[in-house]
Amino acid sequence: MPSRRDLPAIAVGTTATLAAVGLARLAYTPLLPAVIHQGWFHSSQAVYLGAANLLGYLLGALLAVRLSERFDTRKLLGLSFVAIALSFVLCALPAAFSWFFTWRFISGLAGGLLMVVGPSVALTAIPPERRGAVASFVFTGIGMGAILSASLIPMLLRLNLSAAWLVLGLLSIVAGLLADWGLRRLAINHASTAVKADAALPVPALSLATLLVVLAYGLDAIGFVPHTVFWVDFLDREKALGTDAASMQWLLFGIGAIIGPLFAGYLGKRFGWRRSLALGFFIKAAAIAIPLLSITLFWRSASSLIVGIMVTGLVTLTSGRVMELVGPASYKRVWGIGAVSFSSAQALSGYGMSALYGILGSYLPLFAIGSLVMASGCLLLMLTPRAQTVPATSIKLCKNES
Protein backbone atom coordinates (compact mmCIF):
# COMPACT_ATOMS: atom_id res chain seq x y z
CA MET A 1 0.00 0.00 0.00
CA PRO A 2 1.16 3.58 -0.62
CA SER A 3 2.49 5.57 2.33
CA ARG A 4 1.83 9.19 3.31
CA ARG A 5 5.04 10.12 1.51
CA ASP A 6 3.36 9.05 -1.73
CA LEU A 7 0.40 11.44 -1.37
CA PRO A 8 1.94 14.25 -3.47
CA ALA A 9 2.65 11.83 -6.33
CA ILE A 10 -0.84 10.34 -6.06
CA ALA A 11 -2.32 13.86 -6.09
CA VAL A 12 -0.42 14.78 -9.25
CA GLY A 13 -1.17 11.57 -11.13
CA THR A 14 -4.80 11.21 -10.05
CA THR A 15 -5.78 14.81 -10.80
CA ALA A 16 -4.02 14.59 -14.17
CA THR A 17 -6.06 11.55 -15.22
CA LEU A 18 -9.20 13.06 -13.64
CA ALA A 19 -8.95 16.24 -15.73
CA ALA A 20 -7.43 14.69 -18.88
CA VAL A 21 -9.97 11.91 -19.39
CA GLY A 22 -12.45 11.91 -16.52
CA LEU A 23 -13.58 15.50 -17.12
CA ALA A 24 -12.26 16.74 -20.46
CA ARG A 25 -13.58 13.70 -22.32
CA LEU A 26 -15.92 11.53 -20.27
CA ALA A 27 -17.96 14.39 -18.81
CA TYR A 28 -19.12 15.22 -22.34
CA THR A 29 -20.77 11.81 -22.67
CA PRO A 30 -23.73 12.56 -20.33
CA LEU A 31 -23.89 16.11 -21.77
CA LEU A 32 -24.33 14.81 -25.32
CA PRO A 33 -28.07 13.99 -25.14
CA ALA A 34 -28.81 17.33 -23.43
CA VAL A 35 -26.91 19.30 -26.07
CA ILE A 36 -29.10 17.60 -28.70
CA HIS A 37 -32.39 17.75 -26.74
CA GLN A 38 -32.02 21.48 -26.05
CA GLY A 39 -31.27 22.27 -29.66
CA TRP A 40 -27.73 23.56 -29.28
CA PHE A 41 -26.60 21.21 -32.05
CA HIS A 42 -27.99 18.56 -34.38
CA SER A 43 -27.11 14.98 -33.40
CA SER A 44 -24.55 14.61 -36.20
CA GLN A 45 -22.79 17.82 -35.10
CA ALA A 46 -22.86 16.87 -31.42
CA VAL A 47 -21.13 13.53 -31.96
CA TYR A 48 -18.40 15.27 -33.96
CA LEU A 49 -17.72 17.51 -30.96
CA GLY A 50 -16.83 14.34 -29.07
CA ALA A 51 -14.48 13.39 -31.88
CA ALA A 52 -12.86 16.87 -31.75
CA ASN A 53 -11.63 16.08 -28.24
CA LEU A 54 -10.08 12.83 -29.49
CA LEU A 55 -8.25 14.68 -32.27
CA GLY A 56 -6.85 17.21 -29.81
CA TYR A 57 -5.80 14.38 -27.50
CA LEU A 58 -3.75 12.91 -30.34
CA LEU A 59 -1.84 16.17 -30.85
CA GLY A 60 -1.30 16.53 -27.10
CA ALA A 61 0.12 13.02 -26.83
CA LEU A 62 2.43 13.68 -29.81
CA LEU A 63 3.80 16.87 -28.24
CA ALA A 64 3.88 15.75 -24.61
CA VAL A 65 7.39 14.28 -24.28
CA ARG A 66 9.09 17.05 -26.28
CA LEU A 67 7.29 19.84 -24.40
CA SER A 68 7.97 18.26 -21.00
CA GLU A 69 11.70 18.21 -21.81
CA ARG A 70 11.77 21.86 -22.89
CA PHE A 71 9.46 23.53 -20.39
CA ASP A 72 9.02 23.56 -16.63
CA THR A 73 6.79 20.66 -15.58
CA ARG A 74 4.73 22.67 -13.12
CA LYS A 75 3.97 25.42 -15.65
CA LEU A 76 3.15 22.95 -18.42
CA LEU A 77 0.71 21.00 -16.27
CA GLY A 78 -0.77 24.20 -14.87
CA LEU A 79 -1.51 25.57 -18.34
CA SER A 80 -3.12 22.27 -19.29
CA PHE A 81 -5.50 22.40 -16.32
CA VAL A 82 -6.37 26.03 -17.13
CA ALA A 83 -7.07 25.13 -20.77
CA ILE A 84 -9.47 22.36 -19.74
CA ALA A 85 -11.27 24.68 -17.30
CA LEU A 86 -11.64 27.35 -19.99
CA SER A 87 -12.96 24.79 -22.47
CA PHE A 88 -15.95 24.25 -20.17
CA VAL A 89 -16.51 27.83 -19.03
CA LEU A 90 -16.35 29.28 -22.55
CA CYS A 91 -18.87 26.73 -23.84
CA ALA A 92 -21.47 27.51 -21.17
CA LEU A 93 -23.65 29.43 -23.63
CA PRO A 94 -24.90 28.43 -27.09
CA ALA A 95 -22.46 29.44 -29.82
CA ALA A 96 -21.30 28.48 -33.30
CA PHE A 97 -20.26 24.90 -33.98
CA SER A 98 -16.73 26.12 -34.85
CA TRP A 99 -16.40 27.75 -31.39
CA PHE A 100 -17.36 24.55 -29.59
CA PHE A 101 -15.21 22.43 -31.90
CA THR A 102 -12.16 24.63 -31.19
CA TRP A 103 -12.55 24.39 -27.42
CA ARG A 104 -13.31 20.68 -27.45
CA PHE A 105 -10.12 20.27 -29.51
CA ILE A 106 -8.13 22.39 -27.00
CA SER A 107 -9.48 20.35 -24.09
CA GLY A 108 -8.30 17.19 -25.84
CA LEU A 109 -4.86 18.65 -26.52
CA ALA A 110 -4.45 19.62 -22.86
CA GLY A 111 -5.75 16.20 -21.85
CA GLY A 112 -3.16 14.45 -24.01
CA LEU A 113 -0.38 16.44 -22.34
CA LEU A 114 -1.70 15.68 -18.87
CA MET A 115 -2.22 11.98 -19.54
CA VAL A 116 1.38 11.46 -20.67
CA VAL A 117 3.26 13.84 -18.37
CA GLY A 118 1.17 13.61 -15.18
CA PRO A 119 1.42 9.84 -14.53
CA SER A 120 5.07 9.83 -15.67
CA VAL A 121 6.00 12.54 -13.15
CA ALA A 122 4.09 10.76 -10.41
CA LEU A 123 5.48 7.26 -11.04
CA THR A 124 9.11 8.23 -11.61
CA ALA A 125 9.08 10.06 -8.26
CA ILE A 126 8.14 6.84 -6.43
CA PRO A 127 10.60 4.07 -5.42
CA PRO A 128 10.17 0.90 -7.53
CA GLU A 129 8.84 -1.19 -4.65
CA ARG A 130 5.81 1.13 -4.22
CA ARG A 131 5.30 2.10 -7.86
CA GLY A 132 2.67 -0.56 -8.62
CA ALA A 133 0.48 0.44 -5.69
CA VAL A 134 0.69 4.12 -6.59
CA ALA A 135 -0.12 3.39 -10.25
CA SER A 136 -3.34 1.71 -9.13
CA PHE A 137 -4.44 4.95 -7.46
CA VAL A 138 -3.21 7.27 -10.22
CA PHE A 139 -5.60 5.92 -12.85
CA THR A 140 -8.66 6.02 -10.57
CA GLY A 141 -8.94 9.68 -11.60
CA ILE A 142 -10.60 8.56 -14.83
CA GLY A 143 -13.41 6.88 -12.92
CA MET A 144 -13.74 9.78 -10.50
CA GLY A 145 -14.49 12.06 -13.44
CA ALA A 146 -17.17 9.71 -14.73
CA ILE A 147 -18.78 9.45 -11.28
CA LEU A 148 -18.72 13.21 -10.76
CA SER A 149 -20.31 13.84 -14.14
CA ALA A 150 -22.91 11.09 -13.65
CA SER A 151 -23.82 12.41 -10.19
CA LEU A 152 -23.80 16.14 -10.86
CA ILE A 153 -24.89 16.60 -14.47
CA PRO A 154 -28.47 15.21 -14.14
CA MET A 155 -29.06 17.56 -11.17
CA LEU A 156 -27.46 20.52 -12.92
CA LEU A 157 -29.48 19.91 -16.07
CA ARG A 158 -32.63 20.47 -14.01
CA LEU A 159 -31.34 24.04 -13.59
CA ASN A 160 -29.98 24.52 -17.09
CA LEU A 161 -27.32 23.21 -19.43
CA SER A 162 -25.06 26.22 -18.84
CA ALA A 163 -24.77 25.38 -15.13
CA ALA A 164 -23.41 21.94 -16.00
CA TRP A 165 -20.64 23.40 -18.18
CA LEU A 166 -19.69 25.96 -15.51
CA VAL A 167 -19.49 23.40 -12.69
CA LEU A 168 -17.27 21.15 -14.81
CA GLY A 169 -14.97 24.14 -15.31
CA LEU A 170 -14.88 24.69 -11.54
CA LEU A 171 -14.01 21.03 -10.94
CA SER A 172 -11.13 21.33 -13.42
CA ILE A 173 -9.75 24.31 -11.49
CA VAL A 174 -9.97 22.40 -8.19
CA ALA A 175 -8.14 19.46 -9.79
CA GLY A 176 -5.42 21.82 -11.02
CA LEU A 177 -4.93 23.31 -7.56
CA LEU A 178 -4.58 19.84 -6.02
CA ALA A 179 -2.06 18.88 -8.70
CA ASP A 180 -0.05 22.03 -8.00
CA TRP A 181 -0.01 21.18 -4.30
CA GLY A 182 1.47 17.79 -5.16
CA LEU A 183 4.00 19.18 -7.63
CA ARG A 184 5.35 21.65 -5.08
CA ARG A 185 6.06 18.75 -2.73
CA LEU A 186 7.63 16.39 -5.22
CA ALA A 187 11.33 16.42 -6.07
CA ILE A 188 10.55 17.87 -9.50
CA ASN A 189 14.03 19.24 -10.07
CA HIS A 190 15.56 15.84 -9.44
CA ALA A 191 13.01 14.08 -11.62
CA SER A 192 13.42 16.56 -14.47
CA THR A 193 17.20 16.26 -14.36
CA ALA A 194 16.95 12.49 -14.56
CA VAL A 195 14.61 12.64 -17.52
CA LYS A 196 16.74 15.14 -19.41
CA ALA A 197 19.92 13.24 -18.72
CA ASP A 198 18.31 10.07 -19.98
CA ALA A 199 16.96 11.88 -23.04
CA ALA A 200 20.48 12.81 -24.06
CA LEU A 201 21.54 9.16 -24.20
CA PRO A 202 20.97 6.91 -27.22
CA VAL A 203 17.44 5.55 -26.96
CA PRO A 204 17.24 1.73 -26.95
CA ALA A 205 15.41 -0.29 -29.57
CA LEU A 206 11.89 -1.45 -28.82
CA SER A 207 11.56 -5.15 -28.15
CA LEU A 208 9.09 -7.27 -30.08
CA ALA A 209 7.05 -7.68 -26.90
CA THR A 210 6.88 -3.92 -26.40
CA LEU A 211 5.84 -3.32 -30.01
CA LEU A 212 2.99 -5.81 -29.70
CA VAL A 213 1.82 -4.19 -26.46
CA VAL A 214 1.86 -0.74 -28.10
CA LEU A 215 -0.13 -2.05 -31.08
CA ALA A 216 -2.66 -3.76 -28.80
CA TYR A 217 -3.02 -0.54 -26.82
CA GLY A 218 -3.97 1.18 -30.06
CA LEU A 219 -6.67 -1.44 -30.66
CA ASP A 220 -7.95 -0.84 -27.14
CA ALA A 221 -8.54 2.78 -28.14
CA ILE A 222 -11.00 1.67 -30.83
CA GLY A 223 -12.89 -0.50 -28.36
CA PHE A 224 -12.78 2.45 -25.94
CA VAL A 225 -14.93 4.72 -28.12
CA PRO A 226 -18.46 3.19 -28.22
CA HIS A 227 -19.05 3.23 -24.46
CA THR A 228 -17.07 6.35 -23.58
CA VAL A 229 -18.55 8.56 -26.31
CA PHE A 230 -21.90 7.09 -27.39
CA TRP A 231 -23.21 4.86 -24.56
CA VAL A 232 -25.36 7.42 -22.73
CA ASP A 233 -26.89 8.84 -25.92
CA PHE A 234 -27.50 5.28 -27.18
CA LEU A 235 -29.51 4.45 -24.05
CA ASP A 236 -31.20 7.85 -23.71
CA ARG A 237 -32.32 8.57 -27.27
CA GLU A 238 -31.87 5.46 -29.42
CA LYS A 239 -33.32 3.04 -26.86
CA ALA A 240 -35.64 5.71 -25.36
CA LEU A 241 -34.73 4.87 -21.76
CA GLY A 242 -34.55 8.53 -20.75
CA THR A 243 -31.91 10.73 -19.15
CA ASP A 244 -32.18 9.34 -15.61
CA ALA A 245 -31.81 5.70 -16.65
CA ALA A 246 -28.90 6.53 -18.95
CA SER A 247 -27.19 8.61 -16.24
CA MET A 248 -27.50 5.70 -13.81
CA GLN A 249 -25.61 3.53 -16.28
CA TRP A 250 -22.93 6.21 -16.55
CA LEU A 251 -22.64 6.19 -12.77
CA LEU A 252 -22.08 2.42 -12.87
CA PHE A 253 -19.45 2.96 -15.55
CA GLY A 254 -17.70 5.46 -13.27
CA ILE A 255 -17.81 3.10 -10.29
CA GLY A 256 -16.26 0.43 -12.48
CA ALA A 257 -13.61 2.86 -13.68
CA ILE A 258 -12.56 3.53 -10.07
CA ILE A 259 -12.44 -0.19 -9.28
CA GLY A 260 -10.51 -0.92 -12.49
CA PRO A 261 -6.98 0.15 -11.52
CA LEU A 262 -7.22 -1.58 -8.14
CA PHE A 263 -8.55 -4.75 -9.77
CA ALA A 264 -5.81 -4.55 -12.41
CA GLY A 265 -3.15 -4.16 -9.73
CA TYR A 266 -4.43 -7.32 -8.05
CA LEU A 267 -4.45 -9.23 -11.35
CA GLY A 268 -0.93 -8.06 -12.18
CA LYS A 269 0.42 -9.29 -8.87
CA ARG A 270 -1.55 -12.53 -8.94
CA PHE A 271 -1.10 -13.63 -12.56
CA GLY A 272 1.62 -11.37 -13.96
CA TRP A 273 1.25 -8.36 -16.27
CA ARG A 274 1.37 -10.35 -19.53
CA ARG A 275 -1.43 -12.82 -18.82
CA SER A 276 -3.54 -10.25 -17.01
CA LEU A 277 -3.38 -7.83 -19.94
CA ALA A 278 -4.58 -10.47 -22.44
CA LEU A 279 -7.34 -11.54 -20.04
CA GLY A 280 -8.43 -7.91 -19.67
CA PHE A 281 -8.79 -7.54 -23.45
CA PHE A 282 -10.94 -10.68 -23.59
CA ILE A 283 -13.23 -9.51 -20.78
CA LYS A 284 -13.66 -6.06 -22.32
CA ALA A 285 -14.45 -7.55 -25.75
CA ALA A 286 -17.25 -9.61 -24.20
CA ALA A 287 -18.65 -6.69 -22.18
CA ILE A 288 -18.74 -4.34 -25.19
CA ALA A 289 -20.76 -6.96 -27.10
CA ILE A 290 -23.49 -7.25 -24.43
CA PRO A 291 -25.73 -4.50 -25.96
CA LEU A 292 -25.88 -6.55 -29.16
CA LEU A 293 -27.73 -9.27 -27.23
CA SER A 294 -29.75 -7.45 -24.57
CA ILE A 295 -30.22 -4.07 -22.88
CA THR A 296 -32.39 -5.25 -20.00
CA LEU A 297 -31.48 -3.66 -16.68
CA PHE A 298 -29.22 -6.51 -15.60
CA TRP A 299 -27.31 -6.79 -18.86
CA ARG A 300 -26.87 -3.08 -19.55
CA SER A 301 -25.71 -2.65 -15.95
CA ALA A 302 -23.22 -5.49 -16.38
CA SER A 303 -21.94 -3.91 -19.58
CA SER A 304 -21.56 -0.48 -17.94
CA LEU A 305 -19.77 -1.80 -14.88
CA ILE A 306 -17.44 -4.26 -16.63
CA VAL A 307 -16.46 -1.89 -19.43
CA GLY A 308 -15.82 0.79 -16.80
CA ILE A 309 -13.56 -1.60 -14.89
CA MET A 310 -11.64 -2.57 -18.01
CA VAL A 311 -11.32 0.98 -19.43
CA THR A 312 -9.09 2.04 -16.55
CA GLY A 313 -7.91 -1.47 -15.73
CA LEU A 314 -6.33 -1.89 -19.16
CA VAL A 315 -4.54 1.45 -18.83
CA THR A 316 -3.04 0.24 -15.55
CA LEU A 317 -2.19 -3.21 -16.95
CA THR A 318 -0.60 -1.72 -20.07
CA SER A 319 1.38 0.74 -17.96
CA GLY A 320 2.59 -2.09 -15.71
CA ARG A 321 3.53 -4.27 -18.68
CA VAL A 322 5.47 -1.41 -20.30
CA MET A 323 7.32 -0.69 -17.04
CA GLU A 324 8.12 -4.42 -16.76
CA LEU A 325 9.50 -4.53 -20.31
CA VAL A 326 11.51 -1.30 -20.54
CA GLY A 327 12.20 -0.19 -16.96
CA PRO A 328 11.80 3.28 -15.41
CA ALA A 329 14.56 4.94 -17.46
CA SER A 330 12.75 4.45 -20.78
CA TYR A 331 9.22 4.31 -19.41
CA LYS A 332 8.25 7.92 -20.15
CA ARG A 333 9.28 7.74 -23.81
CA VAL A 334 7.73 4.33 -24.45
CA TRP A 335 4.57 5.27 -22.56
CA GLY A 336 4.46 8.40 -24.73
CA ILE A 337 4.61 6.20 -27.84
CA GLY A 338 1.84 4.05 -26.39
CA ALA A 339 -0.23 7.18 -25.79
CA VAL A 340 0.32 8.24 -29.41
CA SER A 341 -0.74 4.78 -30.61
CA PHE A 342 -3.84 4.95 -28.42
CA SER A 343 -4.78 8.52 -29.32
CA SER A 344 -4.18 8.01 -33.07
CA ALA A 345 -6.47 4.99 -33.18
CA GLN A 346 -8.94 6.75 -30.90
CA ALA A 347 -9.13 9.88 -33.08
CA LEU A 348 -9.52 7.85 -36.27
CA SER A 349 -12.17 5.60 -34.74
CA GLY A 350 -13.95 8.57 -33.18
CA TYR A 351 -14.34 10.27 -36.54
CA GLY A 352 -15.00 7.00 -38.35
CA MET A 353 -17.70 5.92 -35.91
CA SER A 354 -19.27 9.39 -35.93
CA ALA A 355 -19.44 9.22 -39.73
CA LEU A 356 -20.84 5.68 -39.60
CA TYR A 357 -23.52 6.80 -37.17
CA GLY A 358 -24.40 9.64 -39.54
CA ILE A 359 -24.88 7.12 -42.34
CA LEU A 360 -26.65 4.34 -40.43
CA GLY A 361 -28.52 6.39 -37.84
CA SER A 362 -27.80 3.76 -35.18
CA TYR A 363 -25.08 3.22 -32.60
CA LEU A 364 -25.55 -0.56 -32.39
CA PRO A 365 -23.05 -1.54 -35.16
CA LEU A 366 -20.37 0.47 -33.35
CA PHE A 367 -20.49 -1.90 -30.39
CA ALA A 368 -19.97 -4.86 -32.73
CA ILE A 369 -16.91 -3.16 -34.23
CA GLY A 370 -15.50 -2.32 -30.81
CA SER A 371 -15.91 -5.89 -29.56
CA LEU A 372 -14.26 -7.44 -32.62
CA VAL A 373 -11.30 -5.07 -32.40
CA MET A 374 -10.78 -5.86 -28.71
CA ALA A 375 -10.83 -9.59 -29.52
CA SER A 376 -8.13 -8.94 -32.13
CA GLY A 377 -6.05 -7.17 -29.48
CA CYS A 378 -6.39 -10.18 -27.20
CA LEU A 379 -5.05 -12.46 -29.93
CA LEU A 380 -2.16 -10.07 -30.55
CA LEU A 381 -1.20 -10.09 -26.87
CA MET A 382 -1.27 -13.88 -26.79
CA LEU A 383 1.57 -13.74 -29.34
CA THR A 384 3.64 -11.56 -27.02
CA PRO A 385 6.83 -13.23 -25.68
CA ARG A 386 6.53 -14.11 -22.00
CA ALA A 387 9.28 -11.83 -20.69
CA GLN A 388 11.50 -10.00 -23.08
CA THR A 389 13.43 -6.95 -22.00
CA VAL A 390 16.26 -7.29 -24.50
CA PRO A 391 15.45 -5.50 -27.77
CA ALA A 392 14.39 -7.97 -30.45
CA THR A 393 14.01 -5.61 -33.38
CA SER A 394 15.95 -2.80 -34.95
CA ILE A 395 12.99 -0.43 -34.77
CA LYS A 396 14.06 2.42 -32.50
CA LEU A 397 12.49 5.40 -30.83
CA CYS A 398 13.36 8.80 -32.20
CA LYS A 399 16.46 10.18 -30.51
CA ASN A 400 16.20 13.44 -28.66
CA GLU A 401 17.78 16.28 -30.57
CA SER A 402 20.04 18.38 -28.39
Task: Describe the predicted segments one by one.
Residues 29, 209-251:
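Extracytoplasmic gate region of multi-pass secondary transporters
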Residues 60-72, 260-272, 358:
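Helix-to-loop junctions at the C-terminal end of transmembrane segments
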Residues 98-106, 298-306:
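Paired small-residue
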